[in-house]
């Protein structure tokens, strides 16, 4: 009996429009035009990032090595923002995270805060307002350690974080990276 009552109340609650009140809309236009679909990539156009001899450092690692003019532009940007430049260097075998070059309590990690310490060139350049002073220190460091990685990092003393870091010298003897045009196979 309850099933019959439930069935009749459901059918009463559903309103069915009369056939004559439903009209097809023949002239509907889309509100937004669909973006054209790009042709799918061919299998021979897809590249694979090679993990062998393709190690990266910091901010601009995906780019080809920076020229002197590009490094000078980055130094200008660091100084103009009031950040504190600091030079660091490391031999090739100490530049990457490994059991021999890092002090850690967990597994291997990446980025600056991984307990992988490079040797600091002098002190951070607190209060430096002259980009030429930073460039002179870069030249002095690269002359003193011609076969070492040299990176410039910038710190924000208000936020107390590293803002950026990039290589200014890669050793000529380094064989652990690929030029940008050979990073994929």
UniProtKB/Swiss-Prot annotation:
Its main location: plastid. SMART domains: RuBisCO_small. It comes from the Eukaryota. Residues 1-45 form a transit peptide. Disulfide bonds: none annotated. Pfam families: RuBisCO_small. It is found in: Plastid, Chloroplast; Plastid, Chloroplast stroma. Keywords: Calvin cycle, Carbon dioxide fixation, Chloroplast, Methylation, Photorespiration, Photosynthesis, Plastid, Transit peptide. InterPro entries: RuBisCO_ssu, RuBisCO_ssu_dom, RuBisCO_ssu_sf. The modification N-methylmethionine is found at residue 46. Gene3D superfamilies: Ribulose bisphosphate carboxylase, small subunit. CDD domains: RuBisCO_small. One of its GO terms (cellular component) is chloroplast stroma. RuBisCO catalyzes two reactions: the carboxylation of D-ribulose 1,5-bisphosphate, the primary event in carbon dioxide fixation, as well as the oxidative fragmentation of the pentose substrate. Both reactions occur simultaneously and in competition at the same active site. Although the small subunit is not catalytic it is essential for maximal activity. The basic functional RuBisCO is composed of a large chain homodimer in a 'head-to-tail' conformation. In form I RuBisCO this homodimer is arranged in a barrel-like tetramer with the small subunits forming a tetrameric 'cap' on each end of the 'barrel'. Heterohexadecamer of 8 large and 8 small subunits. Belongs to the RuBisCO small chain family. This is Ribulose bisphosphate carboxylase small subunit, chloroplastic 2.
